């Protein structure tokens, strides 16, 4: 487990590490061991390359999008113990709640018309860079609607790099691509050095 003192100071480790292109994740089969990874190739979603189908546009009309109103609930949705290969533990949630309190970690939440949390995503923002950590849905298309909203917010605020870490088949269907680590690090430097609006 990430010890409580470490969880409270996790931002002092995570933010500098993310600035080098590393990403954190608990190591499978080794409870409590946190690893830092720098995948090569690296998955990103170009902000002008998100694929939004007509059916997704229609689906989005059924939802309301909010930002940073229920960060913990989004993390718990992403960390649902019923999900296969779950890696988001209560200690991990505590660490990210601290980073949220400090203004580093953010969530995009999607609510249905009844006011229930239908899905969302969370990640870490540093300047013009956003590291998408995880997303979930309880209703069809809700996580995709959150991703569309994130890309819109990033474009509107002048952000430059949406890091997905790995390029899964699901993310590729939404426009994620793989780039070599050297290209990723070049883009990361530009995003960290660039001026993005809050």
Set out the residue ranges of the language-model regions:
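N-acyltransferase acceptor-side catalytic subdomain
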Residues: 1-198
């Amino acid at each position: 487990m990430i010890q409580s003192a470490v969880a409270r100071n996790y931002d002092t480790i995570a933010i500098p590490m993310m600035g080098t292109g590393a990403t954190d994740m608990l190591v499978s089969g080794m409870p409590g061991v946190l690893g830092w990874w720098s995948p090569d190739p690296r998955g990103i979603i170009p902000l002008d390359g998100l694929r939004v189908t007509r059916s997704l546009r229609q689906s989005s009309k059924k939802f309301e999008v909010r930002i940073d109103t229920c960060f913990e609930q989004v993390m718990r949705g992403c960390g649902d113990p019923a999900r296969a290969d779950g890696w988001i533990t209560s200690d991990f949630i505590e660490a990210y709640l601290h980073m949220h309190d400090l203004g580093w970690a953010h969530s995009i939440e999607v609510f249905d018309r009844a006011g229930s949390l239908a899905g969302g995503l969370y990640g870490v923002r540093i300047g013009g860079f956003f590291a998408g950590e995880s997303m979930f849905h309880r209703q069809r298309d809700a996580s995709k609607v959150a991703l569309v909203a994130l890309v819109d917010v990033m474009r509107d605020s002048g952000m430059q790099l949406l890091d997905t870490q790995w390029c899964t088949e699901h993310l590729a269907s939404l426009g994620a691509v793989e780039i070599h680590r050297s290209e990723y690090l070049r883009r990361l430097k530009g995003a960290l050095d660039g001026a993005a609006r809050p």
